[in-house]
Swiss-Prot record:
Protein's UniProt name: V-type proton ATPase 16 kDa proteolipid subunit
SUPFAM superfamilies: F1F0 ATP synthase subunit C
Oligomeric form and interacting partners: V-ATPase is a heteromultimeric enzyme composed of a peripheral catalytic V1 complex (main components: subunits A, B, C, D, E, and F) attached to an integral membrane V0 proton pore complex (main component: the proteolipid protein; which is present as a hexamer that forms the proton-conducting pore).
Topology class, membrane: Multi-pass membrane protein
InterPro entries in alphabetical order: ATPase_proteolipid_c-like_dom, ATPase_proteolipid_csu, ATPase_proteolipid_su_C_euk, F/V-ATP_Csub_sf
Cytoplasmic side: 33-54, 117-128
Length: 164
């Protein structure tokens, strides 16, 4: 039997954080891609020349999944209870890191999807709205970036609970 140093339930919370980061971020990316993709498809029937210009919300929504992947990889590389002690503090730090990034990605994906859908449809009617749509999408994407930054900070706190 291998020896284990630390709390035996702590890795569960760490892996749960990695899963939460990836799952929630990908849910946001999927919603944003689907919602804005429907807008692009319906707009493309009327103005097919604007399809490539209107694909921006779909791309921005797809990036959200990458943020969750980054945090999930950071968390999973920090979980190695056989190499060093892994305590509940570490598991909770990784869980909060994953939830911060994942839920921020989910909310950003919802915002990007709704704004992207309405924005590309409105852009077909009035091309001057394109810059405004892009600015709103950037602010929605910033929500996910905030979650990524906080997630990195929280995951770096793991391992600081002990004096060794």
């Amino acid at each position: 039997m291998a020896s284990f140093s630390g709390d035996e339930t702590a890795p569960f919370f760490g892996f749960l954080g990695a899963a939460a980061a990836l799952v929630f971020s990908c849910m946001g990316a999927a919603y944003g891609t689907a919602k804005s993709g429907v807008g692009v498809a319906s707009m493309g029937v009327m103005r097919p020349e604007l399809v490539m210009k209107s694909i921006v919300p779909v791309v921005m929504a797809g990036v959200l999944g990458i943020y969750g992947l980054i945090i999930a990889v950071i968390i999973s590389t920090g979980i190695n209870p056989k190499a060093k002690s892994y305590y509940l503090f570490d598991g909770y730090a990784h869980l909060s890191s994953g939830l911060a990034c994942g839920l921020a990605g989910l909310s950003a994906g919802m915002a990007i999807g709704i704004v992207g859908d309405a924005g590309v449809r409105a852009n077909a009617q009035q091309p001057k709205l394109f810059v405004g749509m892009i600015l709103i999408l950037i602010f929605a994407e910033a929500l996910a970036l905030y979650g990524l930054i906080v997630g990195i900070i929280l995951s770096s706190r793991a391992g600081q609970s002990r004096a060794d």
